Amino acid sequence: MYKQERYIFRAATEEDIRELAAIEKICFSENEACSYEEVKDRVEQAPEDFLIAFDQVNKKIAGYMSGIHSGSEVFLDEFFQNASLQEKGAKHCFLLGLEVRPEYQGKGLASQIMNRYIDMEEERGTEKIFLTCHTHFVPFYSGFGYEHLGKSPSTWGGESWE
C-alpha cells in the first residue's frame, strides 16, 4: 500500500482531459468507455465532480472518480454522454466511474478515492449517491455502505449492471 502523502487529491482541470480519457480507455471495455469528447464535456461542465489522485512521484494521474449531480432518483445512461444534464446544487450524485491505472490497483488507492469522494459529497450536502457496477464489484461497493438494489435498468455499453 502506498502512503497517502504520495498523492495529491484534487478536482480535474482542462490539462487533465487527455490523460483522463486515456485512463478511461484502459479501465473500461471499448463499448463501456466514454469518448474523449464525453470526458472533455464533463470536465468542462463540472471539474469539481472529478476527484483525481495525482501521483507526485511518477507525475501522473494514478486514478480518479467522477460523477454528475441531478435531482433524479434514476440512474440514466444519458449521464455518461450528456454533461448538460448536470444540475449544480442537486442533492443526488450519480457516480460515473472509478478508474485506477493497472499498476496502482491492489494497493488501496480505489478505496482512498472512494472514501474521499463520499466525504466530499457529504460536505456538499449531497443526500444520496447512486452507482451502477458489474456484479463482481458489488462486494467492494457494499463495503462503503452502498445498498445493493438489484439489477439496474442501465444497458450502458450493451452491458448488464447492478
Language-model features: locations:
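Small/polar loops that bind or transfer phosphate-bearing groups
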Residues: 12, 96, 132-133
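Conserved catalytic-core motifs of GNAT/GCN5-like acyltransferases
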Residues: 72, 132, 142, 147-162
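Active-site rim helix/loop that mediates acceptor-substrate recognition in acyltransferases
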Residues: 29-57, 64-85
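Conserved acyl-donor/pantetheine-binding loop and adjacent beta-alpha core of acyl/acetyltransferases
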Residues: 60-99, 105, 115, 155-162
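A short beta-loop-alpha structural element at the N-terminal edge
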Residues: 6-20
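Conserved glycine-rich acetyl-CoA-binding loop
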Residues: 87-88, 101-115, 124, 139, ...
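Conserved GNAT acetyl-CoA-binding A-motif
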Residues: 114, 119-134
